[in-house]
From Swiss-Prot:
This is Zinc finger and BTB domain-containing protein 6. The keyword Zinc applies. CDD domains: BTB_POZ_ZBTB6. A zinc finger (C2H2-type) spans 301-323, 326-348, 354-376, 382-405. May be involved in transcriptional regulation. Disulfide bonds: none annotated. One of its GO terms (cellular component) is nucleoplasm. Residues 402-424 are annotated as: Disordered. SUPFAM superfamilies: beta-beta-alpha zinc fingers, POZ domain. Transmembrane segments: none annotated. InterPro entries: BTB/POZ_dom (IPR000210), SKP1/BTB/POZ_sf (IPR011333), Znf_C2H2_sf (IPR036236), Znf_C2H2_type (IPR013087), ZnFinger_BTB_dom_contain (IPR050457).
């Protein structure tokens, strides 16, 4: 007991904020930066661990390649992407209210869930304010002339900026299955917001006048996510606001989809491919799923072994371990052996380390190179155990066994087959 009383426990309340400030200072001095992000040819120096913790998209890119240079092309301006990445260090984001939708779309592409939630909440708030202002315009004029308190309240609301905060005490929503009653409430909310959008005269939501000035700025304070969620491995789930019914994936699905599709259609020429990412090895990962957000965003990861689907890749990977499967983060293909996954990833990255000394052709696997060398040497090492045929390639033997003998290469011989082979 005496030994336990001698232990002193220190809790540093501002440790996280102080560390982020110091890392941002080091980033500005270009010290210890291990990655360069190119957003529409605009360079952003940063640290992989910080960017991966705040953006699921960036984390997946870092897992796919060890390159120090990652290139991203977005339909929004490069400044939008730069501010989003900078918010990973500062915990705050200044957004002009008329540009909320631009940041919402870009943050959705970068999978910065906490920013998407706050932008969605702010956007829905201003839509509600605009609708109420239209319906009660005459009544408001009468109240302003008769009630000085209401007039002062309106004057206070006409400010240049608004501060929206995510408190550290906000709980982390780790229940990805929305209850039926919550889903019904959410559906009615989304339908009301959609109908309000249709009533507006402007065809594009990002330029619609919803009752604020062009120079007004909305400041989003993004505090650190609760440590309880981090300990449980839930990196992608945001801190929920007081409006618990605003569930991220469904809300984003309803508010972003039509705008993303219209913006992709507006891009002229050969830019209609949408959003994509490029690494230094020259491999591209097209993101055409953004154009089809309405069809598959709610359950982007479908298990190949069971009917379960998942929104976040962390939960999907954890589930695949139960089936003893390995996932390729680039194309979503699964493998039963890790070595096959590594070989598959080398194909994505264009790495072909095995070269034929005769014709200089390169391959991703040593076994493939060996089969290729059989062409030059004339060897036919793969023997059929059912007949006298032999083959240069293992794949040709498998095809022969399946099509001719109706069996797989690993299937054991029956007794008559063994007797026939012994006679031969």
């Amino acid at each position: 007991m005496a030994a336990e009383s001698d232990v002193l426990h220190f809790q540093f309340e501002q440790q996280g904020d102080v560390v982020l400030q110091k890392m941002n200072l080091l980033r500005q001095q270009n010290l210890f930066c291990d990655v360069s992000i190119y957003i529409n040819d605009t360079e952003f120096q940063g640290h992989k661990v910080i960017l991966a913790a705040c953006s699921t998209f960036m984390r997946d890119q870092f897992l796919l390649t060890q390159s120090k240079h990652v290139r991203i092309t977005i339909l929004q301006s490069a400044e939008v992407g730069r501010k989003l990445l900078l918010s990973c260090y500062t915990g705050a984001l200044e957004v002009k209210r008329k540009e909320l939708l631009k940041y919402l779309t870009a943050a959705s592409y970068l999978q910065m869930v906490h920013i998407v939630e706050k932008c969605t909440e702010a956007l829905s708030k201003y839509l509600e304010i605009d609708l109420s202002m239209k319906n009660n315009n005459q009544h408001t004029d009468l109240c302003q002339s008769s009630d000085p308190d209401v007039k002062n309240e309106d004057e206070n609301s006409d400010k240049d900026c608004e501060i929206i905060e995510i408190s550290e005490d906000s709980p982390v929503n780790i229940d990805f299955h929305v209850k039926e009653e919550e889903s019904n409430a959410l559906q009615s909310t989304v339908e009301s917001l959609t109908s309000e959008r249709k009533e507006m005269k402007s065809p594009e939501l990002s330029t619609v006048d919803i009752g604020f000035k062009d120079n007004e700025i909305c400041i989003l304070h993004v505090e650190s996510i609760s440590t309880a969620g981090v300990e449980n491995g839930q990196f992608s789930q945001p801190c929920t606001s007081s409006k618990a019914s605003m569930y991220f994936s469904e809300t984003q699905h309803s508010l972003i989809n039509s705008t993303v599709e219209s913006r992709v259609a507006e891009v002229p020429g050969n830019q209609d491919q949408g959003l994509f990412c490029e690494n230094t090895e020259g491999s591209y990962g097209t993101v055409s799923e953004i154009q089809n957000l309405e069809e598959g965003y709610s359950l982007r990861h479908q298990c190949p072994r069971c009917p379960r689907g998942f929104l976040h890749v962390e939960n999907y990977l954890r589930h695949l371990k139960m089936h003893k499967l390995f996932l390729c983060l680039q194309c979503g293909k699964t493998f039963t052996q890790k070595k096959n996954l590594n070989r598959h990833i080398r194909g994505h990255m264009g790495i072909r380390p095995f070269q034929c000394t005769v014709c200089l052709k390169t391959f991703t696997a040593k076994s493939t190179l060996q089969d290729h060398l059989n062409i030059h040497s004339g060897d036919r090492p793969y023997k059929c155990h059912c007949c006298d045929m032999d083959f240069k390639h293992k794949s040709a033997l498998k095809k022969h066994l399946t099509s001719v003998h109706g069996r797989s290469s690993g299937e054991k011989l029956s007794r008559p087959d063994l007797k026939r082979q012994s006679l031969l």
